[in-house]
Amino acid sequence: MTSHRKLILASQSPRRRELLAMTGIPFETASVEIDETFDPVLTAEENVMEISKQKAEAVLRSISADEACAVVLGSDTTVVLDGKPLGKPGDFDHAFDMLSTLQGRSHEVLTGFCILHNGKAITDYARTIVEIGPMTPREITRYIEVMKPFDKAGSYGIQDPLLACFVTGIDGCYYNVVGLPVSKVYAALKPLFPAEG
């Protein structure tokens, strides 16, 4: 019965948990470890959708047989500058280099998602254009030291207070940049959870 259907978010990201909670659909979370290396043969859009699917599949394989009818949501976000995905920084210097490159210009943020249920997959992605104004080396250093954006694609969190002074434009879904395109995900989940819609 649809009222007993379980939604599982294939992520421990606090940002994705907060965003999915906005839909009003009850859910659980499951941690997942997969190789998130981009396939150079695929486009950035294809990569975020494929990694999202791999995350959802990994969770689906790990759940018990009585939970096999669960709906599993996987998601992946990347920052793309001049056609090149930036991913998450490995250390301070990498984060500094990324932010130095992003400041003073616009870039794309892509978030892919995959919903698995009853052997079927719904995959999609959202694109948002973000413009970050000029930042001095001192401002970049302070941001990294205070916010520690090492778990964030592109080395920044758009919701971070210290970045607010530098975001000069957003074209597209703000929540997509945070980590989940809430309206697109809700539209895809709504038919599976009609009692919650």
Swiss-Prot record:
Which species does this protein come from?
Answer: Chlorobaculum tepidum (strain ATCC 49652 / DSM 12025 / NBRC 103806 / TLS)
**What are the annotated disulfide bridges?**
none
GO CC annotation = cytoplasm
Subcellular location(s) of the protein: Cytoplasm
Keyword Hydrolase assigned to the entry: answer is: yes
The main enzyme category here is: hydrolase
The protein's role, per its UniProt record: Nucleoside triphosphate pyrophosphatase that hydrolyzes dTTP and UTP. May have a dual role in cell division arrest and in preventing the incorporation of modified nucleotides into cellular nucleic acids.
Q: Which GO terms describe its molecular function?
A: dTTP diphosphatase activity; UTP diphosphatase activity
Using the UniProt record, give the first listed, main subcellular location.
cytoplasm
CDD domains xrefs: Maf
Site, as annotated: Important for substrate specificity: 15, 77, 159
Which named protein is this? dTTP/UTP pyrophosphatase
Specify one Pfam family: Maf
The entry assigns this protein to a family as follows: Belongs to the Maf family. YhdE subfamily.
Give its E.C. classification number. Answer: 3.6.1.9
* Catalytic activity field: dTTP + H2O = dTMP + diphosphate + H(+); UTP + H2O = UMP + diphosphate + H(+)
This protein's record includes keyword ATP-binding: no
Which Gene3D superfamilies does this chain map to?
3.90.950.10
Active site (UniProt): 76
Q: Which GO terms describe its biological process?
A: nucleotide metabolic process
